[in-house]
Swiss-Prot record:
Component of the heterodimeric YscE-YscG chaperone. The YscE-YscG chaperone forms a stable ternary complex with YscF/SctF. YscG interacts with YscE and binds tightly to the C-terminal half of YscF. It comes from the Bacteria. Pfam families: Type_III_YscG (PF09477). This is Type 3 secretion system chaperone YscG.
Length: 115
């Protein structure tokens, strides 16, 4: 039950960042931090920065982390910042993933880059 509650709270916080409820999302992130849910905390913080348009700070913060599941978020930052070679390097790393969702993301980003 506790894990399910943590997941639901993280989802609420992410929805909050998308609707510019950054303070509220940060409160949830702080609570999740106390519960040891660091990857969720970092995702909420990255999402908050990105939804404020601060892609440079999100990328800087994200590059310090060791959470492979956050790599697509960092690729989005590189895309928005026009960092083509960094983005291509990240997409090449992501393309080696066995996760079909990551493969779909990489293919979608590469299609987006063509336009």
């Amino acid at each position: 039950m506790k894990y399910k509650l943590n997941v639901l709270l993280a989802e609420i916080a992410l929805i909050g960042t998308g609707n510019h409820y950054h303070e509220e999302a940060n409160c949830i992130a702080e609570w999740l931090h106390l519960k040891g849910e660091e990857e969720a905390v970092q995702l909420i913080r990255l999402s908050s920065l990105m939804n404020r348009g601060d892609y440079a700070s999100a990328l800087q913060q994200g590059n310090k982390l060791a959470y492979p599941d956050l790599e697509p978020w960092l690729a989005l930052c590189e895309y928005r910042l026009g960092l083509g070679s960094a983005l291509e390097s990240r997409l090449n790393r992501l393309a080696r993933s066995q996760d079909p969702r990551i493969q779909t993301f990489v293919n979608g980003m590469r299609e987006q880059l063509k336009t």
